[in-house]
C-alpha cells in the first residue's frame, strides 16, 4: 500500500510543475494533499523557502490552512455563482484555477483577497478550538473592561485574530515579497485587504449573569462573524475594484483613471480588464458558458441573454422531488407529501465556431 503512494508523491512535484502556470499561490493546492506534514510540505510545488520553513515548523497550522481552502473556494463559487466566470476549480492543477489568474484582473484581485481572508479565518478558528500548539484564545482579553452598556468581565474564549493575521501575512505573503514586479505588489495589496476584511467583522458577544437574567454581571468575548460576512464584503469590494497602474518609481500604484479616488487599504486593485468569459479560451483560461444554466426571467448577470452572450439557449424538461401538501400536526411537527414537479431548465448554447471545444 505504501509503495504505490510513495511513487505517486515522487512524481507529483514534477507533474504539477509542468502543468501549472507560474503565477499562482501554490499553497492553494494544500487542500488536496494528505499524509504526514513532511510529505505535504515537500510535495506542494512552488512554495518558497520561507513557506516551507513555516510548513515544517507548524504542521498543525498547515492542516488548518488546508482545510480552510475548501471553505474559501466554496465562498468564491457562491459569490460568482451567477456570473460567466464562476470561480470553477481544476482538480489536477495546483493553482486551482488554471490560467485565468495569470491576468491581473479584478477576478484575480478577489481570489487573492478571499484566499488570504480564508487563511486568517481558518487559523483563528483553529486557535480558539485548541487545535494549534502555537496559539490559543486571545491572551489580551482578560480582566475588566467597559463599553456603552457599562462594565463587563472578559471571559470565555476571544478569537485570537491577531495571531491569525500575523501568521497569514508571514505565510501567504512570503512568495510575493520575493518578487518586485507589479503583479507581486497587486497581490500583496489584495492579500492585505482580505486579512483586514475578517477583522472588520469581529464582534463582541456577551452573556448575562444574575437573578432572572437581570444582567448584574456580564461576561464578554470577541468572536469572528460567519465567513459569509467577509465574502459578501469582499464581493462589494470586487464590484467597486479600482484599476491602477504602477507609479514611475515602481514602488506603488496610481489610479488608471484620474476621475477615481486613490485606493485605500480596504479596496481591491487590478491592472487588466477582464475577458468576457463567453467562449472557451485556452490562453485566457476561460471555460466559456456553453452548457451553463441560465435564468430566463432574470435581468441580471444570470439571465439567459447575459450568461449565454447572445448565443441563445436550449430548454429541457426535468422532474424533481419536492415537498408538498404540508400540514401542521399538533404538537409540534410539519408533515409533507413527496411530489414530483416538472420544470424547464435553460442552458446556454455552444458557439457555432468549430474550435469552441478546444481544451483549456
Curated annotation (Swiss-Prot):
Glycans are attached at residue 295. Disulfide bonds join 76-87, 127-135, 137-157, 206-220, 208-215, 278-309, 294-304, 308-348, 324-339, 326-336, 331-332. Palmitoleoylation is required for efficient binding to frizzled receptors. Depalmitoleoylation leads to Wnt signaling pathway inhibition. This is Protein Wnt-2. Its main location: secreted. InterPro entries: Wnt, Wnt2, Wnt_C, Wnt_CS. Ligand for members of the frizzled family of seven transmembrane receptors. Functions in the canonical Wnt signaling pathway that results in activation of transcription factors of the TCF/LEF family. Functions as a upstream regulator of FGF10 expression. Plays an important role in embryonic lung development. May contribute to embryonic brain development by regulating the proliferation of dopaminergic precursors and neurons. Residues 1-25 form the signal peptide. Belongs to the Wnt family. GO terms for biological process: atrial cardiac muscle tissue morphogenesis; canonical Wnt signaling pathway; cardiac epithelial to mesenchymal transition; cardiac muscle cell proliferation; cell fate commitment; cell proliferation in midbrain; cell-cell signaling; cellular response to transforming growth factor beta stimulus. It is found in: Secreted, Extracellular space, Extracellular matrix; Secreted. Keywords: Developmental protein, Disulfide bond, Extracellular matrix, Glycoprotein, Lipoprotein, Secreted, Signal, Wnt signaling pathway. GO terms for molecular function: cytokine activity; frizzled binding. One of its GO terms (cellular component) is cytoplasm. A lipid is attached at residue 212 (O-palmitoleoyl serine). CDD domains: Wnt_Wnt2.
Amino acid at each position: 500500500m505504501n509503495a504505490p503512494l510513495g511513487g505517486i508523491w515522487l512524481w507529483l512535484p514534477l507533474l504539477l510543475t509542468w502543468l501549472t502556470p507560474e503565477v499562482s499561490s501554490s499553497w492553494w493546492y494544500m487542500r488536496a494533499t494528505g499524509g504526514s506534514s513532511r510529505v505535504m510540505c515537500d510535495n506542494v510545488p512552488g512554495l518558497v523557502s520561507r513557506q516551507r520553513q513555516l510548513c515544517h515548523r507548524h504542521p498543525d497550522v498547515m492542516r488548518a490552512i488546508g482545510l480552510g481552502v475548501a471553505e474559501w473556494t466554496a465562498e468564491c463559487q457562491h459569490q460568482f455563482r451567477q456570473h460567466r466566470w464562476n470561480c470553477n476549480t481544476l482538480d489536477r492543477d495546483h493553482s486551482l484555477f488554471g490560467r485565468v489568474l495569470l491576468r491581473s484582473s479584478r477576478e484575480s484581485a478577489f481570489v487573492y483577497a478571499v484566499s488570504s481572508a480564508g487563511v486568517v479565518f481558518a487559523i483563528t478558528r483553529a486557535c480558539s478550538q485548541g487545535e494549534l500548539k502555537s496559539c490559543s484564545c486571545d491572551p489580551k482579553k482578560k480582566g475588566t473592561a467597559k463599553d456603552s452598556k457599562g462594565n463587563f468581565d472578559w471571559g470565555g474564549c476571544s478569537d485570537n485574530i491577531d495571531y491569525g493575521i500575523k501568521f497569514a501575512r508571514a505565510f501567504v505573503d512570503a512568495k510575493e515579497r520575493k518578487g518586485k514586479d507589479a503583479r507581486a505588489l497587486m497581490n500583496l495589496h489584495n492579500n492585505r485587504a482580505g486579512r483586514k476584511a475578517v477583522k472588520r467583522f469581529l464582534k463582541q458577544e456577551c452573556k448575562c449573569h444574575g437573578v432572572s437574567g437581570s444582567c448584574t454581571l456580564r461576561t464578554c468575548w470577541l468572536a469572528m462573524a460567519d465567513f459569509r460576512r467577509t465574502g459578501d464584503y469582499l464581493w462589494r469590494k470586487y464590484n467597486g475594484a479600482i484599476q491602477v497602474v504602477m507609479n514611475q518609481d515602481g514602488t506603488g500604484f496610481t489610479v488608471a483613471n484620474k476621475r477615481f479616488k486613490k485606493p485605500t487599504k480596504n479596496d481591491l486593485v487590478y491592472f487588466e480588464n477582464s475577458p468576457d468569459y463567453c467562449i472557451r479560451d485556452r490562453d485566457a483560461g476561460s471555460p466559456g458558458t456553453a452548457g451553463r444554466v441560465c435564468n430566463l426571467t432574470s435581468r441580471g448577470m444570470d439571465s439567459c441573454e447575459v450568461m449565454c452572450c447572445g448565443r441563445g439557449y436550449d430548454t429541457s424538461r426535468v422532474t424533481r422531488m419536492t415537498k408538498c401538501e404540508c400540514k401542521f400536526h399538533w404538537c409540534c411537527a410539519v408533515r409533507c407529501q413527496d411530489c414530483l414537479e416538472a420544470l424547464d431548465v435553460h442552458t446556454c448554447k455552444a458557439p457555432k465556431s468549430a474550435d469552441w471545444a478546444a481544451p483549456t
